[in-house]
């Protein structure tokens, strides 16, 4: 399988040439150096297998010399990708087609058998497989809740706030007739599993130099149905610290009993995060 994983057979990293198209970006990543491309690691779990590959690109005559942040020497560029193979479930999950009036993450699907249909789109929304214990009741406990695990690297100062925020989603699910649809646990310090195992939905603690958002996905779905199989959420340290700083500076939150929850009581960690 080396010819598949150690090449661009699964995912094209280099941009294709567009005849007549504008060359707005002078940076060229170069050619794939197959002799330097390698597996970083291979991880096997009960329901998924991950191949992490480091692709190396060589460009002896670059026209752009990079930057002091992401790339110091453009003559050699490393790109790391993870290829994941996930076991698909066999169940009675019923896909739900997208309604363009409501925003969802979707799997785009085109019905190739509808030759006369001007809009042959059958996009499926991404959603969890939540089932009622008592389907005949308007409101019922769920058979299997969505369980989120707070990663054990998360500072203790923030764990209760994170748990409270996630569990607040139960109010929305109750409106849909699903009781206790979301559960939150803390990953034990001696856990024999890690976030790479798709069976665990993990709220991961991270510290990036310039994150695009305070929290972001991804989730993993069955492309045939749209069922969400698992998800990890990256929680950025800088978002929490900035939130507390802005709150102290601008006194954004009210101390009223019915007002938003305030986190000014939190003591920020003094550890330097790299």
What does each model-identified segment do?
Residues 153-181:
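Zn2+-dependent metallopeptidase catalytic core
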Residues 265-274:
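Single conserved hydrophobic/aromatic residue that forms the stacking wall/gate
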Residues 1-154, 172, 181, 187-266:
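Auxiliary tRNA-acceptor-end handling modules of aminoacyl-tRNA synthetases
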